[in-house]
């Protein structure tokens, strides 16, 4: 279901001068020993970003997952870009989270970087649900204007493709425009905050249970700490 999203993101990254990087051995792809499920991941070197990861899980009609996180260079205090899309085919259920993930919740910081996401939040009302995500504190590393939906086929087929394209454009625009604005957070603190994001997320990642059920505990633990959130590896 999410191949078009994957292709669009990879096309954008390539046009921006991105080049693929090697993943830790054995983590670029895994096939389930119990089913036809397969998970593939990519790591990109993109100008202006220190790390951009992408993951696609195909478990047929039962589950489809698309996930990506972009980490700006430490010289930029820009928000991270986070995408989580899950489709449960048997239940015809969509869970979608698209966010510019703030390093801090300071008003000046939010005013500086979130006008584009605020506009999208208004433009796509069926993706600005008020329901709080259950696994995370919305006041940490999430914005008040994230596009969030627990919906069905209508949102998956109609709203989400348009919202995803607009979301990517808004994030690229944020990055391009903000490069000319001096960061207010020094690089060493940006690194510290990005590391804390990894640690925080690894402790709460709801997808870890899904990966474990499909690909086993050992592989999924490596995937969590070595690829998804590598700064968490020293805090296991």
UniProtKB/Swiss-Prot annotation:
It catalyses: 15,16-dihydrobiliverdin + oxidized 2[4Fe-4S]-[ferredoxin] = biliverdin IXalpha + reduced 2[4Fe-4S]-[ferredoxin] + 2 H(+). This is 15,16-dihydrobiliverdin:ferredoxin oxidoreductase. Belongs to the HY2 family. Keywords: Oxidoreductase. GO terms for molecular function: 15,16-dihydrobiliverdin:ferredoxin oxidoreductase activity; cobalt ion binding. It comes from the Bacteria. Catalyzes the two-electron reduction of biliverdin IX-alpha at the C15 methine bridge. The gene is pebA. Its EC number is 1.3.7.2. One of its GO terms (biological process) is phytochromobilin biosynthetic process. Pfam families: Fe_bilin_red (PF05996). InterPro entries: DiHydbiliverdin_OxRdtase, Ferredoxin-dep_bilin_Rdtase. The keyword Oxidoreductase applies. Disulfide bonds: none annotated.
